[in-house]
Structure formats: C-alpha cells, structure tokens
Swiss-Prot record:
Positions of NAD(+) binding: 10-15, 99-101, 122-125
Transmembrane intervals: none
Protein name, UniProt field: 4-hydroxy-tetrahydrodipicolinate reductase
Organism from which the protein derives: Ehrlichia canis (strain Jake)
Pathway recorded for this protein: Amino-acid biosynthesis; L-lysine biosynthesis via DAP pathway; (S)-tetrahydrodipicolinate from L-aspartate: step 4/4
UniProt xrefs under Pfam families: DapB_C (PF05173), DapB_N (PF01113)
Signal sequence interval, chain numbering: none
Residues that, per the record, bind NADP(+): 37
Primary gene name: dapB
Keyword Amino-acid biosynthesis: yes
EC number in record: 1.17.1.8
Amino acid sequence: MTKVNIGIVGCLGKQGKRLVAEISASPNAQVSAGLVRPGNPYVGQVLGEIVGCNCSAKAIDSLEHLFDVSDIVVEFTNPQTLLECIKMAESKKKPLLSGTTGPAATEMVFEDYIKNIPFLWTTNVSFGVNILAKLVEEAARKLFDYDIEVWEMHHRYKKDSPSGTSLILGRAAAKGRNVPFKKAQYVSGTPQEARQDVNTIGYAVSRGGSDLSDHRIMFVSDEEMIDFNHRTLNKNLYAKGALKAALWLVKQPPGVYTMSDMMAAAE
C-alpha cells in the first residue's frame, strides 16, 4: 500500500517533533519533509536524527518545495504562516490541515481563501475534546437557564487567552443556546455587569507550570452545578489526532472542513 506523504510546517517545534515521530511510526503515512525557517542550522539534516525516531526525511527551508513533495501538509504555527500556507496550498492544489490558534486565526473566514483544496482548521485535534464539545452543545440546549462558565489551566508559556480549546467549548455552548458566539462571551475578572444574561459565556484563565492543559465548562443554577472536564495526560494525543485527520482529509473533495465533519463521517 502506498503511504501518504505528509509535509510538516514547523517540524522542530514541540508539536512538530511529536508529529514527525507519530507519522514515522505509522504504516499508512510517512514524513515527506519538514519546514524550518531560512538560516536554521538544521536545514538539510535528517529529521529522524534530530527528533530521535525512524524518519529519513530532511529539514528544508522552502515552502514551495515542501508542497511539491507532499500529498498533504500539516501546520501548527502562527496566523501569518497559516496564510502563506493557504496561498501555497491553493497554488499547488494540495490539502492543508491547520491547528494554528490565536485570535487572528479564530477570526479568519476561511471560505474567503479556500477554493480548490480540502482544508481543515481546528484549535484542538483531540477526539476527546471534540466529543466533549458535542456534549456541551446538548447540555447548553437542555439547561437553557443555567449560567455557563469556562475555566482553563495552561503552562506559563501559553500566549493566546482564552485558549483555542476554551473557544471550542464556548462555541459549542453558544450553538446549543442558538445565540451568536461573539456576543455570548466575556472574560471573568471584568465587572459583574458583563454577565448580562444566562446566554453570556464566561471565561476564566489560569497559567502556571511547564506542561499543563486542563479545561472545565460549568453549567450553574441556583441549586446545582454540572461540571464537564477534559485533562490532557499525554501531549502525543495531538499528534495522533492530527495524523488521523490528515489521512481523512487527503481523501476529501475541495472545501472547508472541521473535526466535527471528520467525526460525523466515521459514525
């Protein structure tokens, strides 16, 4: 069976290294190349020797070449690089999977950019988180008069706030309540007047330690609190989820997809 050639943008970041190792261990895929910035001292070196796995692909500094040698490209970087990848993917007509987070990525309307390729963007490739989002949507619909609060704990280096995962849960709750997401949120710590009604979704953010990822969403009434929790025990779950998503996406027709689309197709 022919293996799917997967190119990785940002291959030497934390997530990139996990992806290199996970893909290299797969019977269905292989790393075609990994992109690093021009001038990086690892350009031309074998990724397996850098990461410590069985991978013969090399680190390169040409985005165009990465797309040329890949069946699909995966990127977990930043919004500016994501835009560059979208333009190149459209030019080369190659599928693109993005896990880039942050406000700029969250506000992008990908349908304005994607015309000729299958494209999947998500702020969390964990199957558990995306299943939780479905449960949250249903809970928000049924518990229509409960207050909703989202809390997260991440490592001290986490830049975006609230995190992409918190926003996934918030969007799910807003969808369950049938209210616009942007109007249904405030960040805890602002004046209490910010909570205008039960459809306002609150966010509380904590930072500390070096390798934490914990999310809770609470539905609170005067009489009870229902608490959903997702805790990451091993960050390899993101690499596993990204590989599964890439192997699914490469077979899809052009369009903008979500993790929900992939999970629905598997039902």
